[in-house]
From Swiss-Prot:
The lineage of its organism: Bacteria, Pseudomonadati, Pseudomonadota, Gammaproteobacteria, Enterobacterales. Its EC number is 2.1.1.-. One of its GO terms (biological process) is tRNA nucleoside ribose methylation. It is an enzyme of class 2 (transferase). This is Uncharacterized tRNA/rRNA methyltransferase LasT. The gene is lasT. It holds the Pfam family SpoU_methylase.
Amino acid sequence: MRITIILVAPARAENIGAAARAMKTMGFSDLRIVDSQAHLEPATRWVAHGSGDIIDNIKVFPTLAESLHDVDFTVATTARSRAKYHYYATPVELVPLLEEKSSWMSHAALVFGREDSGLTNEELALADVLTGVPMVADYPSLNLGQAVMVYCYQLATLIQQPAKSDATADQHQLQALRERAMTLLTTLAVADDIKLVDWLQQRLGLLEQRDTAMLHRLLHDIEKNITK
């Protein structure tokens, strides 16, 4: 499975360099940056010693949404208190979740927020699943480079697995299901129920391939009967 690392508005060049070095160490190579030019500072390469190829191939996007244009499944890092109605997974819990997704999706992204404020609510809404590192200390904080290393270490086995032959045909099922569900909620005049919409959108990301296909069939039957 291809896994892209996305850094949203990183402020410090050293943090980008540390993230690139962590990626290189664990076999990751695709780094994207949103709304920042800090990687152009010399300090990025000083810290990213031996990881110049990752720095050279960084792709920059103005918004997180644009950076996810070719991604099938998005995981965003945040504190548990920000999760609201989202499913919240530890790094360990992400492994079986993404292993299942790799059988019918080819490209996932792991998103890290700003050093001082993390991701906005609008950015978190773009994620299929939220994740965070459980901390014991009273001041639960990892710097950006440390956080990237934790996740790259945990997920390294996934990028070593060959792509499934049937992934291309099914990888857009989840996005299509989201759009179909929202259309149905609009038809039922409940699309303005924020709690319901948030709950539904985040739980859809947990569905396995068979469940996704079955829900498509259910929505099809509901749509057909509504229009009678």
